[in-house]
């Protein structure tokens, strides 16, 4: 098993953990924050949960495609960008929602837009790599 296959398995596991974590975030927003009357914080946590589920599934699909050698010639930068972006974006929103007056929340709040930029960059790179793979395959035919 080569290094790329190991990293692909790592990203599948990370994606699955993000989906599981997102389910818990959604439950916390619905049952804890809404019960306390903190609707805005609950909405932020819901956004973090939704992004976590979608991006976690995306990580799993991208890593599985790489594992099946669809993108074997390319480094796994889309997964790295998506994983880091998800951590900054959803993690920052979750911290701001669950502990709004804490130092951690103050430190992570500026990371939220950076995470969004990394998420977008990751998907742009997916598009570029896919076009490159299709171009190379069509060139060989």
Protein language model features and the residues they cover:
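Helix-boundary and loop/linker segments of multi-pass membrane transporters
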Residues: 2-8, 35-38, 70-72
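Interfacial helix-loop-helix junctions of multi-pass membrane proteins
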Residues: 30-44, 93-114
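Core segments of alpha-helical transmembrane spans in multipass integral membrane proteins
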Residues: 17-27, 43-68, 80-91
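Hydrophobic cores of alpha-helical transmembrane segments in multi-pass inner/ER membrane proteins
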Residues: 52-62, 117-129
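Juxtamembrane helix-break-helix junctions at the cytosolic face
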Residues: 63-75, 98-101
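Interfacial segments of alpha-helical transmembrane regions
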Residues: 5-19, 73-82
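Hydrophobic alpha-helical segments of small multi-pass membrane proteins
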Residues: 76-96, 108-127
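Short, charged juxtamembrane terminal tails flanking transmembrane helices
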Residues: 1-4, 134-141
């Amino acid at each position: 098993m080569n290094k790329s296959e190991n990293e692909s398995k790592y990203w599948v596991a990370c994606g699955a953990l993000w989906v599981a974590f997102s389910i818990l975030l959604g439950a916390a927003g619905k049952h804890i924050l809404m019960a306390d009357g903190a609707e805005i914080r609950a909405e932020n946590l819901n956004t973090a949960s939704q992004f976590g589920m979608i991006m976690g599934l995306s990580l799993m699909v991208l890593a599985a495609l790489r594992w099946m050698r669809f993108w074997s010639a390319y480094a796994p930068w889309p997964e790295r960008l998506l994983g880091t972006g998800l951590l900054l974006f959803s993690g920052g929103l979750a911290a701001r929602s669950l502990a709004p007056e804490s130092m951690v929340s103050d430190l992570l709040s500026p990371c939220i837009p950076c995470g969004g930029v990394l998420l977008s960059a990751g998907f742009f790179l997916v598009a570029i790599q896919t076009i490159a793979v299709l171009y190379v395959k069509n060139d060989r035919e």
